[in-house]
Amino acid sequence: MTNFITERIPASWSGSCLAIGSVTAFAPMIEGGTTQLPVLIIRLILLGALGTWLIAGLRRSTLSIPRTALWWPIITFLGWSGLSLIWSPYTSVSLQWFLSLLLYAVFFLMILHGVNGEQRIRRFLMLILLMGLFEGGLGITQYLYHGESRAKGTFFNPNFFSTYEAVSAVLAMSLIWFGTEYGKAGKLFLILTATISSTAVILAQSRGGAAAFLTAITVVGYVRYGKSSLFLLLVVILGTILFPNPLKQRLMDVGTQDPYAYTRIEIWDDATKRVQDHPMGIGLGMYKYASFQYRFPIEDAIVHYGKRAETAHNEYLQLAVELGIVGLAFFVLIIMVWTAEIKRIWRPDLPQASQGILVGLCAGVLVTLVHATVDSVFHEPALVLLLVLEGALAVALGRQVRGTQAEPRCFSLPYHAARIVLSLVAVGGLAYLAIQPAAAWLLANQGNHASADHDYQSAISWYQYASIADPGSTAVRDGLARLYVQRFRESGDPDWLHQAATELAVSMSLNPLDGRPPYRLGTIYLLQAEQPIWASYRDSLSAQAAQAFKNSISVDPFSPFGYFELGKLYRGKGDRTSAQEVFERAISYEPNFIPARMALAELAQERGQPDVAHMHLRAIETIRWKYQGWTLSSLEQQFLAVQSPKS
């Protein structure tokens, strides 16, 4: 075989290989590919590749798809995901997630279609190692010289950086332990990559990433050296425990520094309840939006229910919540079929170098799948693309080591210009769908800049453009409503309040799971009721405000603000009993919410119950004394009545 390091890269690659390499190299470069710009670029590259494949095939009157047993479970999973759009409460977001899944399948197709030789497999291995070396070196530099508490490379989350580096490290280790043909330069490169990437995993200080890394290198060692490799695992674990290192220090400190650090058990229990409540799933991407009804308390925090689990911190549970038991089963089926295909590839008589490549690729897949049990790694495009790349390369390697290339599945379609036009329209529609959120984000960002300069009219114009670009975005609607309220405060023109209420009503219709728009709508109705021009509608507006707060409570039952505002309305109407009930419900969830306790004390005084009033006042003093000297967030200040609750 040609030397792994020094083989010459040809002057040109096929278009699919260039697209695969471009996506792989670019994906982690901007915060792991999670923000709007990199997501858009990745999507457009993949859509361009899809369009090219379709047009080329239609011009030849044949669409060819590489054979693999994985297509049926992939198509089944995608089909179920598409079907879930029917019952998703927030279709716009679910549609974007479905597009992501579809393009991951396109990426898989591109790899199987383009990687048709051992040299190309090796070049992509080199790309993975080079990216790991670059990211690892950057992360180590950040930690040692730039004052970062945790290495993170170009990722926004050190945990995801840890996964990326662990994949690179186990691939390099597997090639070292199995390889015999790489020469001195090749071995030095692999040793350097393994060392840099392993060090980066430690400096990232990710508990889940470290566990996944140890699991993977144990598997690699066991396959290569048998049970004796378990001794190496024991040495690594003991070294981590006995000798000072950043990972050990974080494991010791994290519980005292972050009251939310050990809440994963509660989050998983919460996710299990969601699956029980919605066995068919709630829709793609809906986990965080349904979190308002599934908050859980953190007793040591001022705001007990202040945190919402926006992810399950276990991707398999999250799949079950969003796509139901059936969706999770289809995803597990993909893993099982892939595993069966790898078993068919593995043979004791495989060349040792091929064994090293196959084991390294499978270990990289294992890293991501194991880390997915404790973190949200499937939400990071760079990690998912790397997972798909390694999984597909392992399948492609199987075709090479068998010595035969299975004939692709061909679909004959007589050439017709209309088919090409329809394909272009379909790909163009997907591109439009991909561009929508990025365009809205860009336009809204311009609006934010104008708002920061107090140019609210320009800000409104930018947000209106954003609402045209992406009509399904509730964030844009909410931003518009806030700007309209700001314009009302400046001008006193009550028509701005009417426009704000209209935008929030649209937001509620787009996403009925979010408890914030109905609460804000209620506060706007109260502002409208205060305007002289609407004096004759005051009772009606107050009733609408009360209904809005009730809607807020039904969607977000753990937030005290809806109860507080509703209680004030009841109290204003003289209904002290109802007011007392909702104030007491507020403090039953949030005992540190002083505004509700103050209201209860005042109600007790009005009812001639001084002992009850004194009890509430004493509780208020105790709460303030307990948290005296704390650095308070804006929300905590509202709870402790340092500042008034905001609308």
Predicted stretch roles:
Residues 1-83, 89-130, 175-189, 221-235, ...:
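Transmembrane signal-anchor hairpin modules in multi-pass inner-membrane enzymes, especially those
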Residues 31-42, 91-92, 156-159, 190-221, ...:
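Helix-loop-helix junctions and helix-breaking kinks within/between transmembrane helices
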Residues 38, 142-146, 195, 199-205, ...:
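A membrane-periplasm/extracellular boundary helix in multi-pass inner-membrane enzymes
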Residues 78-85, 110-113, 119-148, 156, ...:
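Hydrophobic alpha-helical transmembrane segments
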Residues 143-177, 205-208, 315-319:
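Membrane-interface segments at transmembrane-helix junctions in multi-pass inner-membrane proteins
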Residues 157, 265-309, 316-319, 323-330:
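TM-adjacent membrane-interface loops and short helices in multi-pass inner/ER membrane proteins
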Residues 325-359:
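Hydrophobic transmembrane alpha-helices and their immediate junctions
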Residues 443-647:
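C-terminal luminal/periplasmic domains and tails of membrane-associated envelope-modifying transferases
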